[in-house]
Each structure stands twice: as structure tokens, then as C-alpha cells.
């Protein structure tokens, strides 16, 4: 099991960031450039949850089907139910709080590998994960700072 934690501050307000996390429309892959549009599929969206499949081309392609839950104010969590690499129960969690006019974003990523490829990825994440995830998140925040308002919880 690999756990990566990091935090960063941004000028993007909490509601705007959470709306981007919970936007399951066709624009999602453009908001989150690390997502492969070919792997993105929305299965169901409710008032505070969404079941989706997402993936990236990293390491020959890793996909995950799981549930986003934003029922707790200021928290968005994606829990893996099925993946070609990681065990059910692996997760991403974003805790977002106001920081001046922007946000403090605290991220926890827990990966439980179930394949040899995933074990290698988990090893790499234990060394480079914080930097990689932070850089990916910073790209999204830069996009959000320059775009119009986004509606979350949509498909």
C-alpha cells in the first residue's frame, strides 16, 4: 500500500474547485488533463455521488471504476471499486477549505496494488508521487483560474 499526501494553496475559491471535481460532463478531461478521454465514462450521477470510470495512459494504461462522494462539505473522495491495477478501496481524497480569497487543498492518495504493474507504479508513487500529483493538480488550478464558472455534479 502506498499513501501520498500533499497540500497546496490556490487563488481558486473552494466552491469553484469542488465544482470542477464534481463536473462529470464531456469537458471533464479538459479540466483534468491527466485523464484519458477514451477511458472516461459516466455510469450514474446523483445529488452527492457519481459512479465513473476514469483512466490515464501512464504505465501502459491504468483505469479505475469507482464512486465520487461529495456528501461531506469541503470533501470529495473517489473510492475505487474495480481497476486493472489497484484493489477496491484504494482512494483519492480532497479536503478543501477557504484560505483568504482562495483555497487550501489537502490531498490524500492511497493505492493498494493488485498486479505487478501496479506494484511498480506504487513504488514510483512512493518516491515521485507527491511531485507528480502536485504538478497535475497545479495544471488544473491554472486552467480553473482562467475559465468561467463551472457547475459541479453534472453529467
PLM ranges: what are they?
Residues 22-25, 129, 133, 137-149:
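Short amphipathic alpha-helical signal-transduction/dimerization elements
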Residues 29, 38-83, 139-143, 147-155:
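Glycine-rich portal/gate segments that line the openings of hydrophobic small-molecule binding cavities
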Residues 10-12, 56-60, 72-74, 84-86, ...:
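Beta-strand elements of well-folded, non-transmembrane domains
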Residues 3-5, 52, 61-65, 87-92:
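Short, surface-exposed coil-to-beta transition loops
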Residues 1-47:
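Hydrophobic ligand-binding cavity/cleft-lining segments
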Residues 17-21, 28, 78, 105-107, ...:
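Hydrophobic pocket/interface hotspot
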Residues 11-15, 45-46, 69-74, 95-104:
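A short, structured loop/turn motif at beta-sheet edges
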Amino acid at each position: 500500500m502506498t499513501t501520498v499526501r500533499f497540500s497546496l494553496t490556490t487563488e481558486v475559491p473552494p466552491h469553484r474547485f469542488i465544482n470542477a471535481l464534481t463536473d462529470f460532463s464531456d469537458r471533464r478531461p479538459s479540466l483534468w488533463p491527466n485523464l484519458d478521454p477514451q477511458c472516461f465514462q459516466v455510469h450514474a450521477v446523483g445529488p452527492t455521488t457519481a459512479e465513473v470510470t476514469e483512466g490515464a495512459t501512464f504505465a501502459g494504461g491504468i483505469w479505475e471504476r469507482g464512486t465520487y462522494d461529495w456528501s461531506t462539505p469541503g470533501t470529495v473522495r473517489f473510492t475505487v471499486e474495480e481497476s486493472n491495477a489497484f484493489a477496491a478501496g484504494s482512494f483519492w481524497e480532497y479536503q478543501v477549505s477557504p484560505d483568504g480569497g482562495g483555497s487550501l487543498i489537502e490531498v490524500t492518495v492511497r493505492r493498494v496494488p493488485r498486479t505487478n504493474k501496479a506494484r511498480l507504479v506504487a513504488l514510483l508513487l512512493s518516491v515521485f508521487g507527491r511531485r507528480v500529483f502536485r504538478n497535475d493538480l497545479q495544471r488544473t488550478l491554472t486552467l480553473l483560474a482562467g475559465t468561467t464558472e463551472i457547475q459541479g455534479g453534472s453529467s
